[in-house]
Amino acid sequence: MKLNFYIILLLLLSFVVKADQIMELIKIPNLTLYNLENKNSLAFLKPTKDFFVGSSSENVSCKKNQSQNFNKKFLDAQRSIDKYNDDFFRKIKLKYIVLCSELEIAGIPALGFANPEMKTLILNINTNNSNFERVLHHEVFHLIEHNFNKYFLNISWSDLNLKEFKYSACSTCSNNYSLEKIYNSKGFVSEYAKSTISEDMAETFSLMMSDNYLILDMISKDEILKKKVKLIENLVKKLDAKHQF
């Protein structure tokens, strides 16, 4: 009985240490540990106060959550990550998911942000329900792309598009891009997918993960998108042969 007590005490102390070291680990202040997923070792974090980190030109800011909305979005995020195999996030080096409100990147409102260096995703819980899961998968793909860049070196993604199509110079260079799903668009699942190659890949992956029935319907009518989906499948299978879309 005494041995069991010491084991429980050790686990509790370890839990507190992790919470106290959040600032040191991911360089974001005012966060507390909300939930630790044993299955995939993901830590869900929530802000106790608003936070602002970074320089004036490169910064991330987010606000403390409303508890009711936070709990719902936390459950939504859990359901989304359950679609991945247990060791998937270890492979892509994701350890922390921050859920907060009114996320901004360099002063621009954002739905999500991936920080590969800190092994962290930041998700805006103000995102509407239909887009929240897509945003999570979208940001997961950015981690895949960053940590497995070697898989992307020899692909010619832009060659799949119509010759006259040109991507924008950056993902925020236009105000015309939205996450609204579009059909028969000659290779694109949303307007935002038209911004850059990286965002196009992430948008395609996000819809494959969040609504596979819809993506199957879309590729039955869009040969360009069909090729993109096949390419994404092949890339992800290199990382995890058992991954299911």
Residue ranges of model-derived segments:
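Auxiliary, metal-adjacent structural segments of Zn-dependent hydrolase domains
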Residues: 53-117
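An N-terminal domain-start capping segment
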Residues: 21-23, 80-84, 153
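Non-catalytic architectural context of zinc metalloproteases
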Residues: 20-70, 99-102, 169, 173-182, ...
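A general structural signal for short secondary-structure junctions and capping/turn motifs
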Residues: 2-3, 89, 191-192
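Classical Sec-dependent N-terminal signal peptides that target proteins to the secretory pathway
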Residues: 1-21
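Short coil/turn segments at secondary-structure boundaries
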Residues: 3, 68-72, 127-131
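Active-site-flanking segments in enzyme catalytic domains
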Residues: 96-245
